[in-house]
Each structure stands twice: as C-alpha cells, then as structure tokens.
Amino acid sequence: MEKIAIIGVGCRFPGADNPSSFWELLANKVDVIRELSSRPFDWDSLHEHSVVPTTGKSKSIKGGFLEQVEYFDPNFFQISPREAERIDPQQRLLLEVAWESLENAGILPSTELSGTQTGVFLGATNYDYGVILAKENAQINAYNAVGTSLGIIANRLSYLLNLQGPSLVIDTACSSSLVAIHYACQSLLSGESNLCLAGGVNLILSSEATISLSHAQMMAADGRCKTFDAAADGYVRGEGCGVVVLKRLADALRDGDNIQGIIRGSAVNQNGLSNGLTAPNGPSQQAVIRQALAKAGVKPSQISYVETQGTATPLGDSIEVNSLKAVLMEGREVNQPCWIGSVKTNIGHSEAASGIAGLIKVVLSLQHGEIPAHLHLKELNPYIKIKNTPIQIPTELQQWPAQKEPRLAGVSAFGFGGTNAHVILEEAPPQVKNQNLQERSSHLLTISAKTEPALQALVSRYQSHLQAHPKLELADICFTAKVGRSHFQHRLAVVINSKEQLIAQLAAFETGNHTTGLFSNQASKKPSKIAFLFTGEGCQYINMGRQLYHTQPIFRQAIEQCNEILRPYLEHSLLEILYPDQAEEQIASLLLEQTAYTQPALFAFEYALYQLWKSWGIQPNAVMGHNIGEYVAATVAGVFSLEDALKLIAHRGRLMAEFSAIANQVTYNQPQISLISNVTGNLADEDIATAQYWINHVSGAVQFAKSMQTLHQLGYKVFLEIGSKPILLGMERECQLANEGMWLPSLLPGMDEWQVMLSSLGQLFVAGVKVDWSGFDRDYQRTKVALPTYPFQRERYWIDTGTIQPQKQSLPKKLEIEQQATKTSISNQNAKILQQIETAESSDAFGERSDHLTLLITYLQEQIGRILGFKGSQLPNTEQNFFEMGMDSLMLTELRNQIQTDLNLDIPINIFMEGATIVTLSTQINHQLIPINVTQTVKAESNDQFQLVNVKNSDWIEIEI
C-alpha cells in the first residue's frame, strides 16, 4: 500500500504531558503507577473485591492516572463554562491533545484545515462521566446528552475546527485506537481524506468498570502489569490520550512536513467463534499480523521490534508471544533479533488509548534509535518459549541497531471482544538540507496566546525547550513558530541573532524588561490602515541594501530588473554603483551623488524594498512619495509601468524639453490604490494620469506637511518608510505629528539591515497586521521542528453529585423590577441597573447620553456572564461576538427572553447573529428604548449591520437527532 506519514504527535500519559516527556519516562524505566484518592469512586464496593489494588480500607486505588482531569480551558475552544462542566473530560482532553498534535505538526487549523476533507478517527470506550451525571436527575440539562456521548468526541473536534471529512469514534475495547489508526489510513488511501487526526482517549472517572473487571479476574493484585513474567496476574488500569496527524507520504514530502514516522501497512480482523468472546485467539493474531505485513510489502524477518498487546495474563501473554514466533521466525536468521515489549509495564493498560500509546512509543523509539526497557520481568512465563530464538525482551534501554534498510516495527492491539489490529511502522527518512542562499544575519521569533497569562506561560515553556534542545537551529525554530502556530491577540516578537540571545530576550520579557528588539502588544482585531512613504533624494549611499541583495532573492531580482531596464540610459551599471567592489567604492560614491545616478539608484532600491515587503504580505492601503519617491509610489499604484517609470527617471535630470517629450510618450492609468500627491497634498485625482502632472512635478514644491495631514485625516496610523534612511520620520517630527501613530523605518544607516527590517516587521505583527510568513521564508530551505505547545489556562469544571439543586426550566414573565431581584436569577446589581434604565427610559434625552449605553452594556455583561456560567466577578468581553464567547442557540434564546422580560421589548432573533457583540446589541436596544420624539435623531446613527425582522424560536433552534 501507499505509505502514510506521521507528521504530528500529541499525547498525555501518566507522568508525561507531551511526546518529549513521554520518551524521558520510557528511556528512564519509570513506572508511573500510583495511588489515587481524588476520584468519586464507590470505595465501599471496591473494597469488597480483594483483587482490586486498593490499600487496606483507605480511599485510594492504584493505577496509571493523569493529573487534574477535571480542569479545562473552555475559553480557548470558545465553549461556555456552563456547557464545559457538562462535557465528558475525555472530550475535553481530546480537544487539547488534538490541538497539540496539530501544533506539533506545524499546521494552522484556521487556514490549512478549515473546510477541508480532514478526517477524525478516534477510539473511546468509557462512559464514566455520563454515569456520574445520571446519578441525579436534577442535574440533567440540555448539554448532558451531547456532552457525554462517545460519538461527539470526534464530532466536536470536527465541528470546532470545521473539518469536513469523516468523523467517528470506534469502540473495539482495547484495540479501539489502533483500529482508528487503520481506518484513518484507509480513508487517506482511498482519497476520502487528505489529512487525518487519529488516536484515542481513556479516563477512569467512576468505579463501576473497575468493579466489573475485578469480577472478571482481570486486575493485578499488586497494581502492576508484569507482562511476560511468571507472576503475571492481570493488568492495572491506566489513563491516557494520544493523537497523531496522518498524511499520505508523497503529500508530506511535497509540503515539507516534519515526518516523524511512516505507517507501511495495517490490518484489522476478528476472532469470530473461538474459545470465548473475551478469550485471545492465536490463529487470528497470526492472521492479522500476516495481513499487515502483506499490505506493507514487508517480510517477517525485516521486523526488528514489536510493541505487544501484553496485558499480563499468563494465558494471554503466552498465546501472543507464540503467535509472534510463528510469524516472525519465518526467514529470520539466528543473528537477526526481534525485540518485544509493552508500554503497559510503564503506564498501565490505558484500554481504548492503549494502541495509540504503543504506537507513539515505537515512533519515539525509531526517532531516537533506542528501545526502552520492558519493566517488571523477573522470571519469564514458563509457557513462553523463546530461549535460543531471535525473540528477545529488553530489560534495559538499548541501541536499536541501524540496518541498510530503514528500521521496521510492528504494533499490536487485541480487543477483549475479539477485534484485533496490527500496524507496521517504518522510521522517518533523514532530512537533507541543501542551503545555497546566504543566511539572514538576524531572525524573528513570534509567540502569541489568547491571554496575557498564557503568553507568559508560553514564553517560559520556550526558555525550557531551548535549553533542553540545544541542537535545534535558530532559523528552524523561528520558521516553525511563524508558519506552524496560530497567531492570537496577545503577541510577542523578538529579533535575535543567536539562541543564547533569544533565551536572554525571553528572560527579559518575563521580568518586564523590554530591551531592543523585543516587542509585545495586544493585536487589534481591526488593524490600522498602512501607508507606505517613499523617501526622496538625500538618503542615498553606496551599499544601501547590500545585505538584502545577498540574502533575499526577491530584492535582488527587483534590483537587477531595474538595472537591465536602465542599461540603455546609463553609462555605468547600476549594480556597480550600488554594490561596488571595495576598491571601487570611492568612485561609486562620487557617481552616486550625480543626479543621473542618484535618482535611478533610489528608485531601484525603493522599488526592490517595496517588492520585498509585498512578498511578506505587507501591502499598503495608501502610498505617498517625497519628490523622486513619488515615482515609486505611482509605479506601485499602477499609474505607469516599471519600464515607463525608469524611462522618466532616467530623463528627469535632463533638459525640460527632452523630459517633456518623454513624458508625452508614456502610458498613464488611474492609481489602483490611494495615492497622495505631493504636488497638491491631497488624494491624487485624474490629473496624476497625465504627462503635464509629471512635467509640473519636476519643478513643483513638495507639499509634505499637507500630504501627511491628509493621511492623518483619512485615518492612517501606521507609516512604513520605504527608503534607506528614515528622513520622512524626521520631517514628520518637525510637523509635530510623529506621536500620532506608528512610524517604522526600513533601514537605518550604520545598523544591521536585517535587525532594522525585522524590528519593523515585528512591530507590525504585534499590532495585528497580517503577515505572509510562508512568503517570508519561501527562498530558504527550512524544517518544521517540535516546539512548545499552547499552555491551556485551565480551571475546574466538574459536576459534583448531590451539590446542585434542580434548575428552573422556564423564565418568569414580566414582573416589577424589585420582584425580579428576588424571583429571577438577576443579581441585586442588575436590579439596580434595571431601575436606572427604567428611569432613564422615561427621560427625553435617553438616546443622547452615553451613560445610558454604559448601563445597558453592564446589564448585558451580567446576564451573559450568568448564562455562560462565569465564576465570581468574571465578565464577558464586550467586543467579542457571542459565538466566540461560547454561546449557542439555546443560550441566545434564553438571553433574548430575559431581555424581553426585563425591558419589555420585542427583540428579533437575528439581532444576535452575524458577529453581534455586547456593544452592538446594547446599541440596538438603546435605539429601541428611545422615546418617539428623538427616534429620528438617532436613526441615522444606528448600526445597520442588523436588519430587524421577526424570527420564530422554532425557526432558529434545530437539533438534529
């Protein structure tokens, strides 16, 4: 079969929050089984069964448990706190790990996956949280069914990321997640999906399943998986979650993905009618392994490691090893060892997630070229006959011998209902770099988060990661952070030239010491308009842009294009003047001061600089040029072609009659973007597309101050100077306008060119300007590398049985405001606010005073915070739209009904749609509350984003069953 690449890995296993820490756990022979007492188990029932690994009569149980599974960051996923506490922690954990797997792959869900045929295949079995919530009917609400449904585990992920490929949960017990991997591969191979997320999740939240397994004699008395050992007496339960990102290998190679492993083949089968429903079946195990080998095109003798099911039962272990022997010994020489082991000896049996745990273990082993130790093996099970065979069990971390061909391994998972799965893995191909282009002297690292605390936490993670991975290349770190991470509102940009400097800069940020090259800000959701200002004469010097010329092909190509066009007009090559050999610098400097060369050189340099900024996605909303700079501005605005512009420039310093003749030969067009004329100081009109305008331009005065005033009046706040010196910045300061907005240079004489360029780019980024980061590095050979994943800001969301009173199912009708304070859920503060609104409503000037709008905003914050389930004094963001807050149609209907009841208004449903926020809704309500005699005054000011029409609730709220 066609090979499938594993390009991203995310995991949470006991003692390991990510793949790196999981490998450390495995490599260091760590057994994470521990006692836990913080789960709502039925301890009395557990103690009745002696085989359950409890400690005396204490309320604790042994297992491979995750920390703080009741904690979650709903804000990150735009889920309301109210709904979050009804969502199975397995769903919540899966969302986080899936996001981490995509970050590990360097994939941006919003731009690369949204609306695509991306499949989600997940394994899950346990329904413990549903059992907890079902214990008291009083706690049931509209979110229970969706929140605890196993199928929704996959569907919610697809919904939140807008993934439109297959989305399903597979339950084959212990083999669930490996079966999910198999079907994800099939979806890719058939073309049904172009990318898949596959894996599984398992949490132990109640005692019922443990009691049942104890009755079935499946649990080890000492709480240890002693796989292959003579003392094996069952397994210990464990928790975990793992997700891998899968892609066809050819596509991954084409896209430059970080390939971490390869799936060569996979197979799934069933025991059928055998010794018993839950009994292992040797012939079926052999069959599924042979099928996987056949699909992979691999001989049994090529497999050098197998991650086994290894559930530590005397019969099951011997059947599995004997099945492996029967298959893997075929064609194998005595000196061709095949190692076997089980991750269950480290973390317990994570049941539905056990297959993905084994697969991730093998992927990490292939990456490191080492095989972890198999724990708790003191005396081999006498029924396992591997003495004097190539089958071996590692008891220490050991090298995985390299071979001429890539290393190959197998992973098995056998469900206790008889569904078996086997996957063949191959190590990733080596990455080869052929970097011919001279590297930049500086680099730009971008980091962002949804909140300031998360940004601080992420910076801390980066520091630790950089120190733990000294071999990572700085360019690859910065590349991955830019193209492989979503860019949120709270941003940091750092300009550096070494990893040591990067670590120091991040430490400076943590302490609040914003040093040179360190920029942070909360990005605007609506970035300011950008004006490009093209510098005039007086800023020229030899070697301006030399670093850019040697390191940036787009800049170099633009300079060389101008040089070729100018050859018929200039005696000397422009390149010889701009970038002379050291021995020719004095002559070149003298020539550059001659008008015949000054103007063409400045034009070519600024045109190339513009092309470079444009290739990074930084494009102006308006352009303005000072003197000769206006020719560049007009060119990029489309007034004339590059060839015509250079023809004009080459003749501009000559006799006026000659220039006039040339000007009348040029083809002119109206500007395609806003162009400020420095002849008039206003927006250019149709005159700019005439020869006479450019003839007058030669001797006309430059209206710089007026031009800048025009830009300010048009709302421009970001100014990027396209020139070799920030001359216009100095002139603007003289106009006393420089403190209004952001002024950014492209270059500064005497400073490293990349340091200046990247500083300006970093400031644009933190301000919220969209950057084409792929374009930024398109000319370099970069590699995506593993970087820290998002630090979720978790809080506790858990339903404690017996603590919640029955919820009211309907809202009260219109009552007096004082009654509402006691008979509805409105707080005393809201009652006061409603009194103020009612008083203000009777005033003729209600719609004219901003404090009334403030009252409405406060009222809505209180109501929405209550409906969303916010804790304490937390209030929703007034500029965040309702769906970003996590509100759904049920919540919006509740809000609408409450507003109508409180304010005696008829509120149309669609007022809540199309990006509505608290501010826009308050404005609409404000308009409805205005007395008749002032309605006309305010009507013209109303936000026409919403068309007020009536929509029935039944037309809006639809639940598909």
Q: Residue locations for each model-derived region?
A:
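Condensing-enzyme catalytic core of the thiolase-fold
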Residues: M1-L437, L590, Q611, F640-R654, ...
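FabD-like malonyl-/acyl-CoA
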Residues: A449, G517-A657, V718-M731, S746-G750, ...
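Flexible catalytic loop/linker elements that gate and position reactive groups at enzyme active sites
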Residues: G10-R12, P280-K295, L408-I530, R546, ...
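Short helix-loop capping/hinge segments that flank enzyme active sites or metal/cofactor-binding pockets
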Residues: G63-V69, N669-Q692, L764
